[in-house]
C-alpha cells in the first residue's frame, strides 16, 4: 500500500483547480525560534484551504456516467467549498449537507461556487448521516472529507511540492489533524523519499481523536469535541487515515486555544494574512516543539492549511493571543482596605503596562483587584506574584483559568448575600436560534438564576456561565438536567476566582 500511495500522489490530478502554493520564509518567527521556519501557504488556494486538492482528485477519477449523476458531501466548512468548486469545474451537480449552525458566510461561499446547500441537524454527525441517506435516495456519489485513498493522495501532493521546493535538510514538518487525510497523504509521500524527516501531527487539546487513537491502538470516538478550531473538530478519525498515521506519524503535539490565537497573530505579523484556528495549529506546534527540544539552526516546515476565518472572531483571537504568547498575565490580588494600599500596589507593578485594572471593596478590611499586566515571559509573571506577596498582598495567578478568561474579566458585581445554594457552571452551546431558550426552558421553574454571562465570540458555538440556586435536596434533579441537556459543561464551584470575586 505504501508504494501505491506514492504512485497515486505522483499521478494525482489536482492542478486543474489547485495551485502549487509557495513555501515562504517567516522572518520574525524564525528569529524568535532561532530556527528557520517555512510556511506552506495552502491558505492561498482559491477556496482558502487545501481541501480542493483531495475533492477534485477523487471526483475527476469517477467514471463519466457516475460523475454525471452528481456528488454529495457533508461539511461545515472547507471540504464543502472544495467539493462545490470541483463539481463546478467538472460540470456536475453537488449537494452539500451542512449543519443548521453553519455560519452564513460559509453557506454563501458554497452557493457561490454552484453547490446546492441542504441545512440539516445541529452537528456534523447529523449532517453526515443525512448525506448518506440522500446518497442512496438520489443515486449520488459521496465524497468523504478524509477517509478515501483518492482524497488522501490529493492532499499528499502538498508533501510532493514541499520536497520539490526545498531540497536541503528538513528537521520536521508540522501538520494539523482533523480526520487525518492531510497528514496521511503528506506522511505517505515524505516518509517514502525522505524517511529522516519527522512528521508531526497537531491537534487541539480538546479535539484529540487521533492522539487518543494512536495511544489506544484503535480508533477512539470522542464523546465531546472542542469547536474553536472548527476545521479539525472531528469526533472519530478515518479507518484508512488511522492506519497510515500509525505508520508515518512520529508524534502528535496538542495545543491550547491561547497558543493557537498567538500563532494566528504570529503569522499575521510575518505575512499580513489571517489564518483560521485550524490553519494556525501547525505553527503553534512548531513553536512549542522548538522550545521543548531546545533546537537551533534547524529547518521546520508548518502547513498553513486554511484561512476561512469569520471576521467577528478576531476580537476573541486578539484578546487571547497575548496570553498564548505569555505576554500578558492576569492576577487577582487582595489588598487591605485602607488609605495608600492602591498606591503601594501600583508601586509593585512599576513601569509595566496594564491591560486592565478593576478594583472592588470586599468588606471593611479588604478589597479585591483584578489586573492584567503585560509581561516579558512566564518567569516575569512568577516574579510579580513573589513581589505582591512580599508586600503582604495575597495573590492568585489566573492566567490559565478559563472561567476568568472567558467570563469573569468581562463581568461586574461582587458577592451577593442573596445567592444561597448557588451552583456555578460553564456551558458551550450551538449558536443557533432557540439554543439559549432551550437551555432556560429546560430548567426547573423552581431554580433561580442568580448569575449569567454570555459573550458572542463569532464562533459556531457560544459560551455562557450561569449561577443557579438549587436546593440540596434537588441535586439529583440538577444532574439529570445536565445529562439531558446535551451541551458540554464544566463545574466551576471550586474555582478560586469565582470564590474571590463572586461566590
Can you annotate each of these PLM segments?
Residues 1-435, 439-503:
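PLP-dependent amino-acid enzyme catalytic core
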Amino acid at each position: 500500500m505504501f508504494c501505491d500511495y506514492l504512485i497515486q500522489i505522483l499521478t494525482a490530478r489536482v492542478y486543474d483547480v489547485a495551485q502549487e502554493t509557495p513555501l515562504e520564509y517567516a522572518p520574525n518567527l524564525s528569529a524568535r525560534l532561532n530556527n528557520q521556519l517555512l510556511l506552506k501557504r495552502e491558505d492561498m488556494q482559491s477556496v482558502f484551504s487545501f481541501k480542493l486538492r483531495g475533492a477534485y482528485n477523487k471526483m475527476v477519477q469517477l467514471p463519466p456516467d457516475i460523475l454525471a449523476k452528481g456528488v454529495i458531501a457533508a461539511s461545515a466548512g472547507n471540504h464543502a467549498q472544495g467539493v462545490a468548486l470541483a463539481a463546478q469545474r467538472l460540470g456536475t451537480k453537488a449537494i452539500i449537507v451542512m449543519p443548521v449552525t453553519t455560519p452564513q458566510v460559509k453557506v454563501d461561499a458554497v452557493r457561490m461556487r454552484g453547490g446546492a446547500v441542504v441545512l440539516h441537524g445541529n452537528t456534523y454527525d447529523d449532517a453526515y448521516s443525512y448525506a448518506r441517506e440522500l446518497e442512496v435516495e438520489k443515486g449520488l456519489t459521496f465524497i468523504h472529507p478524509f477517509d478515501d485513498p483518492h482524497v488522501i493522495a490529493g492532499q499528499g501532493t502538498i508533501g510532493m511540492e514541499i520536497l520539490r521546493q526545498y531540497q536541503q535538510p528538513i528537521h520536521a514538518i508540522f501538520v494539523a489533524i482533523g480526520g487525518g487525510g492531510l497528514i496521511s497523504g503528506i506522511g505517505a509521500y515524505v516518509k517514502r523519499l525522505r524517511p529522516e524527516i519527522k512528521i508531526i501531527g497537531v491537534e487541539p487539546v480538546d479535539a484529540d481523536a487521533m492522539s487518543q487513537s494512536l495511544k489506544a491502538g484503535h480508533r477512539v470516538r470522542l464523546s465531546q469535541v472542542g469547536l474553536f478550531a472548527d476545521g479539525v473538530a472531528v469526533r472519530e478519525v478515518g479507518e484508512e487515515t488511522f492506519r497510515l498515521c500509525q505508520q508515518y506519524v512520529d508524534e502528535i503535539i496538542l495545543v491550547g486555544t491561547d497558543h493557537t490565537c498567538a500563532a494566528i497573530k504570529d503569522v499575521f505579523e510575518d505575512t499580513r494574512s489571517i489564518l483560521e484556528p485550524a490553519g494556525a495549529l501547525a505553527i503553534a506546534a512548531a513553536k512549542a516543539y522548538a522550545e521543548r527540544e531546545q533546537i537551533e539552526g534547524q529547518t521546520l516546515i508548518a502547513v498553513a492549511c486554511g484561512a476561512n476565518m469569520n471576521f467577528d472572531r478576531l476580537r476573541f483571537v486578539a484578546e487571547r493571543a497575548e496570553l498564548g504568547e505569555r505576554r500578558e498575565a492576569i492576577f487577582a490580588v487582595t489588598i487591605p482596605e485602607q488609605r495608600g494600599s492602591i498606591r503601594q500596589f501600583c508601586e509593585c507593578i512599576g513601569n509595566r503596562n496594564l491591560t486592565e485594572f478593576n478594583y472592588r471593596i470586599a468588606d471593611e478590611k479588604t478589597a479585591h483587584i483584578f489586573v492584567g499586566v503585560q509581561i516579558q515571559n512566564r518567569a516575569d509573571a512568577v516574579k510579580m506574584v513573589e513581589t505582591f506577596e512580599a508586600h503582604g498582598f495575597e495573590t492568585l495567578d489566573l492566567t490559565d483559568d478559563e472561567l476568568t478568561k472567558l467570563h469573569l474579566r468581562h463581568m461586574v458585581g461582587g458577592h451577593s448575600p442573596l445567592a444561597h445554594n448557588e451552583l456555578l457552571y460553564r456551558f458551550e452551546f450551538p449558536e443557533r436560534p432557540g439554543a439559549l431558550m432551550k437551555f432556560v426552558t429546560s430548567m426547573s421553574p423552581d431554580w433561580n438564576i442568580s448569575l449569567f454571562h454570555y459573550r458572542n465570540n463569532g464562533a459556531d458555538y457560544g459560551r455562557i456561565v450561569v449561577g443557579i440556586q438549587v436546593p440540596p435536596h434537588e441535586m439529583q434533579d440538577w444532574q439529570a438536567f445536565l445529562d439531558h441537556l446535551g451541551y458540554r459543561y464544566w463545574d466551576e464551584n471550586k474555582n478560586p476566582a469565582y470564590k474571590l470575586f463572586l461566590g
